């Protein structure tokens, strides 16, 4: 590994440093470091700051796109080589349109962002979070319950053919966990679980500072967890036992059973987490039945969290997703009460600091890592 490669790697990981600090960390002569930094500056990869006392990545050396593909929308973000977001856009999708049409829509959205780059700006990587397990290393969407027809879709390969840059694909909850670890409440936390509560439920797991995806990429797929052992052999279909209760869909369904909504909507037709908001609104208006519904569901969530704690013993549990914002105080209090009852030494429970931006933030970080790895290999 060349000294040029090592210096670039250290500048990338530190964000900003100084020549003397680089020399100390890498065990190199200061004169060697200074000469190599001048080479990296000439290549446009890094830049001196504060009168050459500091050095950091050149933000204009390249750009990345981070994408959050949800069950009802696609959110795009364009960031520079230092990870600063430059612009964002959001589009609605038709989930039933099928993979081919949605992939074309995503490609068009990426091209629209790339068209906004400076004249000599270069796209260097794209990362995308999807509502599905992803086959490790292959970037194959295994199955996406909220996107009909998305089974064994080779999304990574499709995007690589179109843009000729490195592509990273990951489950949406995992991507949110990456974002939270980069710039959220889990920053510098080695072992934590991010629980995403939206239309469905999922989790991203960090062990020893690294994302854990499991044998098939399905680690954290909480929707099939069962917390009612007498019903262990019932078939809950693609929804799964846990998700049929502990999710936006579950809250909406239970709300329609217990509250006089006068909406005429059937629970089976509900698709979005916003359909649970009428339960949260009823709670804010003092409806006791709404409180009963939510306490019952949050108690079930607490049992699930206690099981996670028993298996992983994490340092922190983070809650994110649209549903986590509906009644955060009641949710945290109920879950905490249940977990403390079951576990003698439970970890702290916190709400996501990034909320709706967690997945996009994780995608930007992942794309940056890809871009920087690609550049570093050229210097090895």
Stretches with model-predicted labels:
Residues 1-50, 56-122, 162-163, 229-233, ...:
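ATP-binding/phosphotransfer module of carbohydrate and carboxylate kinases, centering on a glycine-rich
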Residues 81, 122-241, 245-256, 362-380:
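Phosphate-binding/catalytic loop of phosphoryl-transfer enzymes
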């Amino acid at each position: 590994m060349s000294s040029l490669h090592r210096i670039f790697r250290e500048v990338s990981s530190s964000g900003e440093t100084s020549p003397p600090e680089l020399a100390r960390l890498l065990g190199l002569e200061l004169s060697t470091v200074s000469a190599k930094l001048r080479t990296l500056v000439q290549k446009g990869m890094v830049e001196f700051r504060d009168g050459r006392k500091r050095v950091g990545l050149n933000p204009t050396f390249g750009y990345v796109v981070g994408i959050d593909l949800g069950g009802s929308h696609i959110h795009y973000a364009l960031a520079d080589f230092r990870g600063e977001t430059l612009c964002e856009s959001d589009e609605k999708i038709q989930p039933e349109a099928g993979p081919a049409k949605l992939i074309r829509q995503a490609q068009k959205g990426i091209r629209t962002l790339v068209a906004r780059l400076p004249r000599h700006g270069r796209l260097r990587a794209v990362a995308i979070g999807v509502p599905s397990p992803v086959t490790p290393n292959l970037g194959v969407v295994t199955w996406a319950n909220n996107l009909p027809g998305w089974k064994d879709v080779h999304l990574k390969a499709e995007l690589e053919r179109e843009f000729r840059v490195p592509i990273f694909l990951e489950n949406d909850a995992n991507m949110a966990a990456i974002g939270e670890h980069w710039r959220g409440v889990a920053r510098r936390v080695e072992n934590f679980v991010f629980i995403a509560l939206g239309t469905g439920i999922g989790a991203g797991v960090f062990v020893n500072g690294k994302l854990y995806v499991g044998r098939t990429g399905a680690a954290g797929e909480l929707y099939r967890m069962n917390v009612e052992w007498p019903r262990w052999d019932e078939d809950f279909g693609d929804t799964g036992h846990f998700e049929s209760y502990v999710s936006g869909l579950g809250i909406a369904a239970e709300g329609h059973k217990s509250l006089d909504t006068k909406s005429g909507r059937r629970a089976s037709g509900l698709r979005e987490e916003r359909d649970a908001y009428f339960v949260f609104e009823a709670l804010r208006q003092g409806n006791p039945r709404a409180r009963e519904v939510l306490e019952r569901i949050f108690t079930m969530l607490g049992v699930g969290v206690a099981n996670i704690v028993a298996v992983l013993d994490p340092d922190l549990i983070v809650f994110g997703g649209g549903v986590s914002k509906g009644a955060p105080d009641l949710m945290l209090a109920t879950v905490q009460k249940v977990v403390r009852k079951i576990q003698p030494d439970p970890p702290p429970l916190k709400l996501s600091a990034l909320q709706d931006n967690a997945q996009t933030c994780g995608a930007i970080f992942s794309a940056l890592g890809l871009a920087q790895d690609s550049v570093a290999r050229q210097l090895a």
